[in-house]
Amino acid sequence: MFKGSIVALITPMNEEGEICHSSLKKLIDYHVLNKTKAIVSIGTTGESATLSQEEHIEVVMLTLKLANKRIPIIAGTGANATTEAISLTKRFEKSGIEACLTVTPYYNKPTQEGLYQHFKAISENTKLPQILYNVPSRTGCDLLPSTVARLSEFKNIIGIKEATGDLSRIHKIKKLVKDDFLLISGDDPTALDFIQLGGQGVISVTANIAAKEMTQMCSYALEGNFKSARSINERLMLLHESLFIEPNPIPIKWLAKKIGLIKSDTLRLPMTPILNSTRTQIEKALQYANLQKI
């Protein structure tokens, strides 16, 4: 269902911290033009943790409206309370989204059985396709391959965004799940290797400002043309790494503003503006990447 470069879209805001509709439209048009395979609306990069539930729903619905069926939309619907995750997921059932991205519950650190029961409950309360999202560096809990395998038995749990950066995970998961279970990287620096090991694509932060390059890289890799894919990835590697010097999405929002994709790099507290030292490193990485002009 989902293969190639999928963007983890930033949520543009004006200087007052309100959602910027015009910048969101520009971002969506940019990804349609450059053949990004899908948009994730309101994931980690979209600042889900600092939006109210009403804003969360508003942004997803606005993204759907502005995309106008030109590109598939995946909605982030995870929460650390199972009832809240179910409620949010059900709000989108008739919206037109293609799937939900459901992060592991953060802060409360459930056991593997707790994680299984959490995702099982969501699956049983909706018909929407679910993509599991494992990012222990953010959430404080790790969805292990054995638990992923148990969850893969549910028909509407169709895959996982695996963002540990641990390439051994793909081998472990692949051995335990059916061939049609989607394995999607959530880590730009290791995404190409992830695809080469059998993954179907990446949900990418870098794609916010390098949509064409990420689409080309993933397409080459999925075709088995790893020489061409690596040529692109080598240009992007410094950029991949520099975008995580500070917590995501601080660097990517600043860079998106710098190249003219959004009007403001406003973030909500506790996220704070980018440091000057980080700007310098990103500017060097941007120059090395030699991206297509916007």
UniProtKB/Swiss-Prot annotation:
Transmembrane segments: none annotated. Its EC number is 4.3.3.7. It is found in: Cytoplasm. Gene3D superfamilies: Aldolase class I (3.20.20.70). Keywords: Amino-acid biosynthesis, Cytoplasm, Diaminopimelate biosynthesis, Lyase, Lysine biosynthesis, Schiff base. It is an enzyme of class 4 (lyase). One of its GO terms (molecular function) is 4-hydroxy-tetrahydrodipicolinate synthase activity. The keyword Lyase applies. The record marks T44, Y107 as: Part of a proton relay during catalysis. The active site is at Y133, K161. GO terms for cellular component: cytosol. It comes from the Bacteria. It catalyses: L-aspartate 4-semialdehyde + pyruvate = (2S,4S)-4-hydroxy-2,3,4,5-tetrahydrodipicolinate + H2O + H(+). Pathway: Amino-acid biosynthesis; L-lysine biosynthesis via DAP pathway; (S)-tetrahydrodipicolinate from L-aspartate: step 3/4. GO terms for biological process: diaminopimelate biosynthetic process; lysine biosynthetic process via diaminopimelate. Pyruvate binds at T45, I203. Its main location: cytoplasm. Belongs to the DapA family. Catalyzes the condensation of (S)-aspartate-beta-semialdehyde [(S)-ASA] and pyruvate to 4-hydroxy-tetrahydrodipicolinate (HTPA). Homotetramer; dimer of dimers. This is 4-hydroxy-tetrahydrodipicolinate synthase. It comes from Buchnera aphidicola subsp. Schizaphis graminum (strain Sg). The gene is dapA.
